[in-house]
Structure formats: C-alpha cells, structure tokens
Amino acid sequence: FAGKPGAGKTTLAKILVKNIDCDYLYINATDERSIDVMRDKVGAFAASGTFKPLKIVILDEATHILQASQVILLNMMETYSLTTRFILTGNYPERLIDPLRSRCQEFDLSPPSKKVVAQHISTILDKEDIEYEIPDLVTIVNKFYPDFRKIINNCQKYTVDGALVLGEL
C-alpha cells in the first residue's frame, strides 16, 4: 500500500490480516530493515510451520528497507510463495528495487476530499458525544489535511470536558 503519511496504509494492512484466517508477522521496517532482520525474523517466520492456511508478513514502511535486504526479501517472496504473502506499506514506492516492486500489486491510498474527511470527523465526534462548532472542525481539517491521523489526534488534543475547544491553534 502506498500513500501519504496518515492515509491508513498500516491500518488497512492490519484490518486485512485480522479478517483472514492466518498467522502474521508485523515488522516496522523503519527500525528493522537490515539483512539480519530479513533473514532471521522474516525468513524464520516464512519457513516455519502453521496450522492456518496462510501466513502474512506485514512490512510497514518497507521503503526504508536497505537495498541488500530487499534482494533477500525478493528471494523469500519467491521461495515461500505457496504459503506466505507479503504486505508492504510505504510513502515512497519508487525506493523499492524494480524486481521487488514488479512482484507486488500496488494500491495507492489517495486521500478523500476535505469535505469527506470533515464529514467523517463529524460522525466520529457525534458518536463520541463531543460538542463542536463547524468552523473549528473546518480549521482542524484545513490545517492537517491530508493526514487523517493528525486530524484525529488534534481533535483528541483539543477536546476538553466533552467539547472541542481550539483556543490558539
């Protein structure tokens, strides 16, 4: 999954694995991107047995994986293709080596319009019984769009005693 920060790439990957009968391994490739991680963690997981029909490896922020590690990952994808699927997320898919990228189905998570985001945030605030003024909601959406995560976090940050209070945003 490709897209800007806060687009929902990681959330979508986690939703997928939770709704499939599978074992899965999650790795944040920003922190764990070395050859050793690919060989020891990913390789060991892919090679291990399972009672489930499928195994999935989520490599979050895969565009941070070192180039040499990408080659190892490519080999694992080919070796374990019958039992293991790989979900790669990242902001910059062009950083992946071409042979790896060509083996992936790319989904670009483009942000919805500001209007759709504002409507969704309004629904969340209503369900959480948080009072708000439309101009305040519009201010938050305009300031942090298209980063949905930042919009939600700032709504939480500026909620005091059940009301969205911006003050000096």
Language-model features: where?
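P-loop/Walker A NTP-binding region and its immediately flanking N-terminal helices
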Residues: 1-107, 115-122, 126, 134-142, ...
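A Lys-centered signature of the CheY-like receiver
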Residues: 110
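Short, conserved phosphate/pyrophosphate- and ester-handling motifs at nucleotide-, phospho-/glycolipid
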Residues: 147
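Active-site-proximal segments of catalytic enzyme domains
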Residues: 159
